[in-house]
From Swiss-Prot:
<dbReference type="InterPro" id="IPR012340">
    <property type="entry name" value="NA-bd_OB-fold"/>
</dbReference>
<comment type="function">
    <text>With S4 and S5 plays an important role in translational accuracy.</text>
</comment>
<feature type="modified residue" description="3-methylthioaspartic acid">
    <location>
        <position position="89"/>
    </location>
</feature>
<dbReference type="GO" id="GO:0006412">
    <property type="term" value="P:translation"/>
</dbReference>
<dbReference type="GO" id="GO:0019843">
    <property type="term" value="F:rRNA binding"/>
</dbReference>
<keyword id="KW-0694">RNA-binding</keyword>
<protein>
    <recommendedName>
        <fullName>Small ribosomal subunit protein uS12</fullName>
    </recommendedName>
</protein>
<dbReference type="GO" id="GO:0003735">
    <property type="term" value="F:structural constituent of ribosome"/>
</dbReference>
<dbReference type="GO" id="GO:0015935">
    <property type="term" value="C:small ribosomal subunit"/>
</dbReference>
<keyword id="KW-0488">Methylation</keyword>
<comment type="similarity">
    <text>Belongs to the universal ribosomal protein uS12 family.</text>
</comment>
<dbReference type="InterPro" id="IPR006032">
    <property type="entry name" value="Ribosomal_uS12"/>
</dbReference>
<keyword id="KW-0820">tRNA-binding</keyword>
<dbReference type="Pfam" id="PF00164">
    <property type="entry name" value="Ribosom_S12_S23"/>
</dbReference>
<dbReference type="InterPro" id="IPR005679">
    <property type="entry name" value="Ribosomal_uS12_bac"/>
</dbReference>
<comment type="subunit">
    <text>Part of the 30S ribosomal subunit. Contacts proteins S8 and S17. May interact with IF1 in the 30S initiation complex.</text>
</comment>
<dbReference type="GO" id="GO:0000049">
    <property type="term" value="F:tRNA binding"/>
</dbReference>
Length: 124
């Protein structure tokens, strides 16, 4: 326990919690331009070609964003919206591309979890 004199000389410092998504600047989403769209391989023990994009955000950050869903239409200079959320088996990927927003098309022929992939309701 600190004495009153110690607290007068050096007050208690508030705890600083570290964010997992620093590039978002406490915003829910950020817009950015794709600088590179490519595939990468996950960590062991998984095996795949995961689709990712290198994105230059409006605040100047350059981040790697995962492109979820089957198939995509992204290429260099596409304008996309990103959200937080890491991909556990891809080191350094802390953001997700939002499907169905800006230049990123939704997943066609998606029947379930449509809202997560920007898919319209199918004509029954």
């Amino acid at each position: 326990m600190a004495t009153v004199n110690q607290l007068v000389r050096k007050p208690r410092a508030p705890k600083v919690d570290k964010t997992n998504v620093p590039a978002l600047n406490a915003c829910p989403q950020k817009r950015g331009v794709c600088t590179r769209v490519y595939t990468t391989t996950p960590k062991k023990p998984n095996s795949a070609l995961r689709k990712v994009a290198r994105v230059r955000l409006t605040n100047g950050f350059e981040v790697t964003s995962y492109i979820g869903g089957e198939g995509h239409n992204l290429q260099e200079h596409s304008v996309i919206l990103i959200r937080g959320g890491r991909v556990k088996d891809l080191p350094g990927v802390r953001y997700h591309t939002i499907r169905g927003a800006l230049d990123c098309a939704g997943v066609t022929s998606r029947r379930q979890s449509r809202s997560k992939y920007g898919a319209k309701r199918p004509k029954s």
